[in-house]
């Protein structure tokens, strides 16, 4: 028989009170005189019909697409750069910088480029720029994981408009990677001449270019009048750096910005109820999972794992921890991706959980240390699962460490259990299942060769129907083995003025700004 966890609901009230009293620290301001950059001149631009103004939650570390992994940095990249291919509204790959592409064999992608594309500095795009971009991406610690398939040594520039991209192994998601803004094509000559400058004033082929960057305040873009493709509908774009979420919302309400990024959960309903604003929200590609360390007792016992899973009232857990802004996970990756299969959620059943524990040899339960790091979400999650597991006699002793310690413990397999929400780089199961390769040293440690065999088959099979069958078999097996518990699909929200058109939610949290118009 199902029942709601009264302890979990009570915890919600306690947590809300604690958070209401929490103080927020302020980030130190950057002195433009010390940074060697121009001081802001005049007032910060207000939202207007000829310009687009966007409030960011932080300052980009870099505009070099291979020197960061932050989603709002990539939002700028959609204006500055182009990719070889892109995807249309139906999910089909269509030309962008490339006019033609073909797999001539499993390890060779033959690509022909447009001959009318020029960078912001007036130089023409060539296949040398493409090879340099892919070489850079594969070597960067920020992007190497999604370019592991790329073979720089055997990739060949045929002529200025033609390149044979070589793969180290067959990889079905190659075009998905190349269509991502994480594959933005950079200017080889400019990048090599001054890598430091490229982080702040990158040279791309996109519809806008960087004009000014005032540290701690704003980044200004102007239209590229010589753009080869469809021009954007605004002459200027300004990224305003507004760290406080409440201030971003106020700026949106008062017309100071057209779009606000990463709204506070508490402001979502406020935006929805305002007829002059629109909440643009949806599920992200990411998923939060409760991971068991399957290499240590008692978590190496499938009956224990199943017992702990059945003891979780996921509906209450997600409601409490994500404050109503996430959905209970039904499977092992986002439902929008190829081959998704709804496997759960697993039934909440305390009596069954107790029976499974007894069958596993733990009729009186057991105790263990649950280690997490200090964020509101992590601490609340730890407290709620602690309460739920206590109902079946399992004592989870909560240990709070700093992020660096947590990361080190996870990477060395020292956590007993953990809430992990890995960032998914591309919308493909080969990337979404990032926790599962057997070679990873994180605390999941399933050491199950069958999983690795299915992962390899799914990522290397080019036939889409076969890929679906493989990934669905894998999801069935993951559900059966209960190495993890899929918990939540987090949602994400932007706010926009009602007169902003063409601003569409993207599950990777990187909306395409080139489609936006104002007024």
Where are each of the predicted segments found?
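Ligand-site clamp/hinge motif
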Residues: 225-270, 395
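Alpha-helical secondary-structure segments
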Residues: 126-133, 160-164, 206-207, 234-236, ...
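Extracytoplasmic/peripheral linker and loop segments enriched in polar/acidic and small residues
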Residues: 110, 395-406, 431-498, 519
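Long beta-strand-rich cores associated with HINT superfamily self-processing modules
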Residues: 356, 494-519
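N-terminal lobe/hinge region of extracytoplasmic solute-binding protein
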Residues: 55-104, 135, 203
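Gly/Pro-rich hinge or "lid" segments in bacterial periplasmic/extracellular proteins
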Residues: 88-92, 179-232, 236, 351, ...
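Structural transition elements
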Residues: 8, 323, 327-359, 377-379
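Surface-exposed binding/hinge segments that line
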Residues: 102, 147-190, 212
